[in-house]
């Protein structure tokens, strides 16, 4: 599949589920059902707004991220995850201490999502990172994903941090009991 197509499919799936069920049905580990997961889609960004963001950071934005912005200039979803609007990306990055050409694009409860456009501009599609609230970029988790694959995986895991899934059977049971 061509880069930038998956984001269209994922967003269409969300909208279909919300339209059909009135919400996005979610099941958390241990069978906990969260029935009122919400999605608040922003209006599309204009081409001028997208160019302004690229100019602001002196970067070429990843194709799939630009596709998302052209469809929805930001999104709040799953009761605690936010993909920032272009205006908020520029605003919130004023206080971030990130390497050149790296910028914050969203939040996951108390963590942050960061694009490393240095990687993208070199042809590497694994450009998305996750930082806990107090982490510095050198402590970031490499999500081994681009924007649309991260978004698809995050939704497939019902908003859980899929990169932190416990693989040890005993520890998995212990985490559910907590």
Identify the residue ranges that each predicted region occupies.
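A C-terminal-region feature
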Residues: 1-48, 71-178
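Amphipathic alpha-helical segments within well-ordered protein domains
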Residues: 50-54
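A glycine-rich, hydrophobic loop/mini-helix early in the fold
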Residues: 64-69
